[in-house]
Amino acid sequence: MRSLPFALTVESVSARAPTCCSTGRFTQGRQPCKCKACGRGFTQSASLLQHWRVHSDWRETLSLSPVRQDLLWPLQPHQAPASPLGRSHSSAGVRQGFSGQLCCWLTKEHTLAEALRLSPVPAGFWGPVEADRPPANSHRRVCPFCCCSCGDSVNEKTSLSQRVLPHPGEKTCRGGSVESVSLAPSSVAPDSTSGLRPCGSPGSFLQHLPPSTLLPRPPFLYPGPPLSLQPLVPSGLPAVPAVPLGGLEVAQVPPATQPAAQQEGAMGPRSCASAGRDSREAVQAPGYPEPARKASQHRAAGPLGEARARLQRQCRAPPPPSNPHWRGALPVFPVWKASSRRSNLARH
């Protein structure tokens, strides 16, 4: 391959744009692409551009792999990258290429100061570094003065009586030695008889609670008997006196009627109206006759009882079978009878 003239090499070009006029590969051992900063020559312009990054940005220099660290060998001490940590001078190849002293910023003291200024680290990593004490603001202040009633703490003694409002039924703390008194009987200290207790005494905060939490609870009121056991008295009649909690007074049934009641229970269940009347008679207080019922109530009792019995029979009836043509399992309902008859006629 024909070689290019020497006048077209990168030496005649400005150092700010180190490029080569040709991108071909030279096989005669010449290195026409030279770096103006360090004087190293390369056979390709791509290698020169990659090498120029060493002089332009020191951040990319720190991220170079060990294979490409040979690009840093021809660097001079005064042309070292402006790195505050000086990591580019830690490789063995770079130390071999340096013949003089290192730059002034590579000294131990200057490196430590620059590293602490740029990226602060915890104490003990670079040595005993004294950190400035944080400013004493309201969030970091110590509040040594505590109220013996509510437990709130303040930073000044005067604020204890100015900012903290006095609690109901209690006296404010004066000078840290004045006692406080509460309306609750359980808050009185066992040692004193007047109910006064010095601030900061053991158990003063736990025992000095608001009166609402220390008052005894009211006795539990048991509810009355259920409505089903209370006598049914119309609004026109006088009120029946309350039945005591010890038990219900059951009206005494005459001995002549007891055999009849036993015979009636042995014969079978009675109607709902008669059962309800008997239960009212049993719960009825002595001395009051059974309230008279209107004629309309007697008339409504019959249809309601029949409807209730009809609903019970329908609930007890078995579900319809899967085969509607099986007449033996069909219940007595006219709708299902009609449907079965139609299906039988259709089949025949």
UniProtKB/Swiss-Prot annotation:
The keyword Metal-binding applies. The keyword Repeat applies. It comes from the Eukaryota. InterPro entries: Znf_C2H2_sf, Znf_C2H2_type. Keywords: Metal-binding, Repeat, Zinc, Zinc-finger. Gene3D superfamilies: Classic Zinc Finger. This is Zinc finger protein 843. It comes from Homo sapiens.
